[in-house]
């Protein structure tokens, strides 16, 4: 939610929509990746909880980028675009726990799981930074 408010306030101040979308998304994804990458090296469960909380908060900021970009791309078809993208995203939600369970069984450690998650966030943040657009694609 905070990402949406932040993005809207920056756009109202005159910043270009594309710049704002990319900025909040990059902050959210790369900031979240930084937090996740530190988790395997923590000895205290409190520091792990704090880092996971920061990761979630930063994910909320990223929603002001990728989460509302659907409306930029196809204002008339936002619901359909969100539904399609959400359906594709659910594939990861189904597969991730299975893969994490297999990795835990094989290694007995969360280290690789957090590294994979960090890589996905870094890749997603950089991909969005270079390829995101706000021009209407669906009319």
Label each PLM-derived region with a short phrase.
Residues 1, 37, 94-95:
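Hydrophobic/small/kink-forming positions within alpha-helical transmembrane segments
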Residues 53, 57, 83-91:
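Transmembrane alpha-helical cores of Major Facilitator Superfamily
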Residues 6-7, 11, 100-108:
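Interfacial helix-cap and linker-helix signal at transmembrane-aqueous boundaries
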Residues 33, 39-40, 117-139:
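Multi-pass alpha-helical transporter architecture, strongest
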Residues 20-23, 102-120:
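A membrane-interface helix-boundary motif in multi-pass transporters
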Residues 11-13, 69-79:
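Paired intracellular helix-loop junctions of major facilitator superfamily
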Residues 20, 77-84:
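Cytoplasmic loop-to-transmembrane helix junctions
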Residues 18-65:
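C-terminal transmembrane helical hairpin of 12-TM major facilitator-type secondary transporters
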